[in-house]
């Protein structure tokens, strides 16, 4: 372990010192540098000494062999040089050393020397590109080292496009082989000519260190500084020069010049003049102007200072002052050597002064003056394009687009790089059509297109915006969002593109991403009123009014614009109305109205009050509120339509038509207004007019982005289509309504998807909830269903007449018809009441038939079976059916019923008339036949003919009440007539009241009265429970729930009941009794009495969706009460032809035996 630690330390130390080791030059590198130095300075002794040592240290180094090769070649030893070249080819055939040496060897041949001479001739005659091509051909891509390399790159430097490359190569050669004065001389001149003065002086300073180059460096250096204008900079430059060079003619001249300049600069006026002139030459107008102004003040007739001042103003862009000073300079010294320069500058500044003044006039909306100035500029210089451009801008200001187009085109012919002309033409063509503008832009060069990149982006943005809007109208939100992203890339940070993108993402279901985009925008542009307004709209549009107001209030009120103020007013009004609506929904409508009436007069509030009055059928108050609106706004469509709807509700169709006719004719009516018109037309019976309105309105709503308005149009349009007899089209319209209301972002394409979307959602608003519910109701109304069910039930009793075991097999087919559903029903019923117990003689004397008068004998077992059929139809208002009791029973009758349902506000009611069988026993339901040993007569088959009224009150809140009152005449074959009145009522409280789960507890009460007690089974009796007094109270508890594919109900109740019966004759119809037995029959009776006690019920019902088309279910219930204890068990299967993936029924809805309707 210790050894390992030491090794790690050693390795770390080695790695740490490695860079320092590599940084230090090796002996070989130092000797090779001495070789190159000796070659550059033509010191062969230094070359030989270095090569001798190198060949001892590293004889096979390609660079060493190449150096020996060059040495031999310089000595004229061609054979020796060739041997070294051959050796180098073996050592490093791919090295630069070998390639360079091979080229050098070639140059020693006659052909090589001739080719080199030709290249040099081309270079000296000014054919630099041809010379470089010849060099490249000769060198084959590998220039030799030394003077030939300097010669090659000096020639390359004569090609302007490659000058920088050549300078860098010459600097490299100078660094590798310092001391080549010819190279340094040439390199310095190239650097100065390329305005790389500091680098040039650095080369000269290097050159001055050698005796061979010092004099040349001094001359070049002095030549670069001697003509500098007198200034501190020129003095500094001379001092720097004299610090490096100490002798020679240039030094003497520099010393004299330095003394003179120092003397001149001691004069403040001269110093200011000199510094100003120097600053002008350096392009430093800001520094030059105050210096030259001082000089001119000292000598107002100094034409050179005036001219320089004019030049300085020109550099600064101050055309007016430039013109004034240049004119003075020319007037003072018409023959100055600077006149040509001053005249040129004067012309330029007069031209641009006129252009500037023309632009200013155009900006001041004075096109006539602008035109004169641009024309004046054109007269000064008719070769420049900007005067013509200005005339084009004047034509644009006058909206003379043909003239503007001509001027801009002329501008481009004069100067294809004039981007303003390109922009002007692009704007003209954009006004004509986007396509023409895009075609023009496509014809431009790359540089011209770059100059109007913003216009091209804007055109692309407009095109993408149109495409996105088309996709939004089709409900293709994700695709629209992709285009909005492209728009945002063209215009990053755009408030309204970000808003549109966020809206599309929200509609596409990507709500988190949409929220993030808007939040980021708010952070980036926190003080931008447009951002605040857009984010406020976004939040309020997604039911976040309070958040919208909070965001708006983060902006100082002084920065609010009219849009923000209008939005705030609307949101505050919404909050007031929201509070009022909550009060109203909680049953405090009077308080809600009082609160609204305390608000400032508002059309919106008056319309709300009118709507509330209309809903509670207070038509007088509704009319008054609508009239208040019309007093302020006589053409208010909402108020006119409101009065129309009030008149329709009041049944005054003539007044309604009169109101509808007052509606202002306009092509700009909102979708909601048109929807209400169509509904009014339909309610007035103008079906054709309503059809035309909806036919025009529905396509408009489909083309709109999702909104409450378009969703309501499509919802009501679908209802109208269904009512008009086109339910198939109505279902298609409901699919569009789902998209418009935000139920889904994609229109459903199949029944499973469509019906799955009808499932309730706790997060839905009232509109989504209504669209789902209405679509589900119509779909199920149009579906074909087949249900097969088997029900077993029974109750214990006496064998032969009341020990009942019953089986009912039901088959029902439901199909759409008109606006309701028709059905066909068949029940196969088997009832078995057991067998009589016999005495030793095989007879029985039970209280059945006439057995108490004469012992009966014969068939002990009592049962019967038969099949009933029925047809019927029902919708939301009417329901009727007609059918039979089971055919095959002893007594068969036609039965049925009819009912009508409606509501009065929150109170629902149903009235009905009916003829129904009493099915609680075989005797009451199907009749029995007295023993053949006695009378053999049939009796029973009791039917209830009567009417009923049912009431219910349930506003969807926690409490509900129901009640039922009915009266019936009870008759049967050979049964004493009877009648009954029944009252039932109940209250329930919803402990849990959710869409898919409900738990209730309640209190029920029943009061029954039968005229006679005919519960016996003797001949003439009815065999049905018929107390003269019956009172019961029950406390039911119910749990109902559904999931995606299950639905169930579990219920139980505890009850207390009291009943009383009168003593009744056992044989109430003496005409049925043989004469010999009548005396005994008259003496017999069924004793009356009273009883009371407790009971219970338990019920479980379960249904499962197996597939979209198949459903199965089962149920069981157990009842135990005084004098009544039936129990049931059933199984059923239901088939849906169209398939159903919507909500499961809650609770499940098995078939009810037709006899129990």
Swiss-Prot record:
Entry-linked Gene3D superfamilies: Tetratricopeptide repeat domain
Stored PROSITE patterns: TPR (PS50005), TPR_REGION (PS50293)
Keywords: Cellulose biosynthesis, Repeat, Signal, TPR repeat
Coiled coil: none
Cleavable signal peptide: 1-23
SMART domains linked to this entry: TPR
Its biological purpose: Required for maximal bacterial cellulose synthesis.
The protein's name: Cellulose synthase operon protein C
UniProt source species: Escherichia coli (strain K12)
Primary gene name: bcsC
């Amino acid at each position: 372990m210790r050894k390992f630690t030491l090794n790690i330390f050693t390795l770390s130390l080695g790695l740490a010192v490695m860079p320092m080791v590599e940084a230090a030059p090796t002996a070989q590198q130092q000797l090779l540098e001495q070789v190159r130095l000796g070659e550059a300075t033509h010191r062969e002794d230094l070359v030989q000494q270095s090569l001798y040592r190198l060949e001892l240290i590293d004889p096979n180094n390609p660079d060493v062999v190449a150096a020996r090769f060059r040495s031999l070649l310089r000595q004229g030893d061609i054979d020796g040089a060739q041997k070294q070249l051959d050796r180098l080819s073996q050592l490093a055939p791919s090295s630069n050393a070998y390639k360079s040496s091979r080229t050098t060897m070639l140059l020693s041949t006659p052909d090589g020397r001739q080719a080199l001479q030709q290249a040099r001739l081309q270079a000296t005659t000014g054919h630099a590109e041809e010379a470089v091509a010849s060099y490249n051909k000769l060198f084959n891509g590998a220039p030799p080292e030394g003077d030939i390399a300097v010669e090659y790159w000096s020639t390359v430097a004569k090609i302007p496009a490659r000058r920088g490359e050549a300078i860098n190569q010459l600097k490299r050669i100078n660094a590798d082989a310092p001391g080549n004065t010819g190279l340094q001389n040439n390199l310095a001149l190239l650097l100065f000519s390329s305005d790389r003065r500091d680098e040039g002086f650095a080369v000269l300073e290097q050159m001055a260190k050698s005796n061979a180059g010092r004099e040349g460096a001094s001359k070049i250096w002095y030549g670069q500084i001697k003509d500098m204008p007198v200034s501190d900079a020129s003095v500094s430059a001379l001092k720097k020069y004299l610090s490096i060079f100490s002798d020679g003619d240039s030094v003497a001249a520099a010393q004299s010049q330095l003394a003179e300049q120092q003397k001149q600069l001691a004069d403040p006026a001269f110093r200011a003049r000199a510094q100003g002139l120097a600053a002008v030459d350096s392009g430093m107008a800001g520094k030059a102007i105050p210096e030259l102004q001082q000089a001119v003040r000292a000598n107002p007739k100094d034409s050179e200072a005036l001219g320089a001042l004019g030049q300085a103003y020109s550099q600064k862009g101050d055309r007016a002052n430039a013109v004034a000073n240049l004119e003075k300079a020319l007037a003072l010294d018409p023959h100055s050597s600077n006149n040509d320069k001053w005249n040129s500058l004067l012309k330029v500044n007069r031209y641009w002064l006129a252009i500037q003044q023309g632009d200013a006039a155009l900006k001041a909306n004075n096109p006539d003056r602008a035109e004169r100035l641009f024309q004046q500029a054109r007269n000064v210089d008719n070769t420049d394009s900007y005067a013509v451009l200005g005339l084009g801008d004047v034509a644009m200001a006058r909206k003379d687009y043909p003239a503007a187009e001509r001027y801009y085109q002329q501008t481009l012919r004069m100067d294809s790089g004039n981007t303003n002309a390109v922009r002007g033409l692009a704007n003209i063509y954009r006004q004509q059509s986007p396509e023409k503008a895009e075609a023009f832009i496509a014809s431009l060069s790359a540089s011209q297109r770059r100059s109007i990149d913003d216009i091209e982006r804007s055109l692309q943005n407009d095109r993408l915006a149109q495409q996105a809007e088309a996709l939004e109208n089709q409900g293709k939100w994700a695709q629209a969002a992709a285009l909005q992203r492209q728009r945002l890339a063209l215009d990053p940070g755009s408030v309204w593109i970000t808003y549109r993108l966020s809206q599309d993402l929200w509609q596409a279901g990507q709500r988190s991403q949409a929220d993030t985009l808007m939040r980021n925008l708010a952070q980036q542009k926190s003080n931008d009123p447009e951002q605040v307004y857009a984010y406020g709209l976004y939040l309020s549009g997604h039911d976040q009014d309070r958040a919208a107001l909070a965001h708006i209030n983060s902006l100082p009120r002084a920065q609010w614009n009219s849009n923000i103020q209008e939005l705030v007013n609307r949101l505050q009004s919404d909050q007031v109305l929201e509070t009022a609506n909550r009060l109203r929904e909680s049953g405090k409508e009077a308080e809600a109205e009082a609160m609204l009436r305390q608000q400032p007069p508002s059309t919106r509030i008056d319309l709300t009050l009118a709507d509330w009055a209309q809903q509670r059928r207070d038509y007088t108050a509704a009319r008054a509120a609508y009239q208040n609106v019309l007093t302020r706004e006589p053409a208010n469509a909402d108020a006119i339509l409101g009065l129309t709807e009030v008149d329709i509700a009041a049944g005054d169709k003539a007044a309604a038509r009169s109101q509808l006719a007052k509606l202002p004719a306009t092509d700009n009516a909102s979708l909601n207004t048109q929807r209400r018109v169509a509904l009014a037309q339909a309610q007035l019976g103008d079906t054709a007019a309503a059809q035309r309105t909806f036919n025009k309105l529905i396509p408009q709503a489909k083309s709109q982005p999702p909104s409450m308005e378009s969703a309501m149009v499509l919802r009501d349009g679908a209802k109208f289509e269904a009512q008009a007899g086109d339910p198939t089209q109505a279902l298609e319209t409901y699919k569009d309504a789902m998209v418009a209301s935000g139920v889904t972002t994609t229109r459903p394409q199949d029944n499973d998807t469509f019906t799955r979307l009808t499932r309730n959602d706790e997060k839905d608003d009232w509109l989504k909830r209504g669209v789902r519910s209405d679509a589900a109701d119509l779909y199920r109304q149009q579906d074909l269903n087949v249900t097969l069910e088997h029900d077993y039930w029974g109750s214990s009793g006496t064998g032969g007449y009341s020990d009942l075991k019953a089986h009912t097999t039901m088959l029902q087919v439901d199909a759409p018809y008109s606006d309701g559903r028709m059905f066909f029903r068949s029940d196969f019923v088997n009832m078995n009441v057991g067998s009589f117990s016999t005495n030793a003689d095989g007879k029985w004397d039970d209280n059945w038939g006439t057995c108490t008068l004469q012992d009966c004998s014969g068939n002990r077992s009592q049962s019967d079976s038969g099949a009933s059929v029925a047809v019927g139809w029902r919708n939301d208002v009417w329901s009727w059916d007609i059918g039979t009791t089971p055919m095959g029973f002893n007594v068969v009758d036609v039965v049925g019923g009819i009912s009508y349902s409606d509501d009065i506000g929150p109170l629902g009611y149903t009235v009905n008339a009916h003829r129904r069988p009493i099915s609680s026993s075989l005797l009451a339901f199907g009749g029995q036949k007295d023993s053949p040993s006695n009378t053999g007569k049939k009796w029973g088959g009791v039917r209830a003919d009567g009417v009923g009224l049912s009431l219910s009150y349930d506003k969807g809140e926690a409490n509900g009440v129901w009640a039922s009152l009915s009266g019936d005449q009870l008759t049967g074959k050979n049964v004493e007539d009877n009648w009954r009145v029944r009252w039932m009522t109940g209250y329930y409280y919803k402990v849990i009241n959710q869409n898919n789960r409900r738990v209730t507890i309640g209190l029920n009460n029943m009061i029954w009265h039968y005229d006679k007690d005919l519960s016996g089974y003797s001949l003439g009796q009815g065999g049905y429970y018929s107390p003269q007094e019956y009172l019961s109270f029950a406390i039911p508890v119910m749990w109902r729930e559904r999931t995606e594919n299950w639905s169930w109900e579990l219920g139980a109740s505890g009850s207390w009941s009291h009943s009383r019966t009168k003593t009744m004759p056992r044989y109430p119809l003496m005409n049925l009794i043989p004469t010999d037995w009548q005396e005994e029959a008259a003496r017999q009776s069924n004793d009356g009495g009273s009883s009371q006690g407790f009971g219970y019920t338990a019920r479980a019902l379960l249904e499962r969706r197996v597939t979209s088309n198949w459903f199965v279910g089962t149920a069981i219930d157990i009842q135990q009460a005084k004098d009544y204890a039936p129990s049931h068990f059933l199984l059923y299967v239901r088939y849906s032809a169209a398939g159903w993936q919507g909500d499961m029924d809650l609770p499940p809805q098995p078939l009810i035996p037709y006899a129990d309707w």
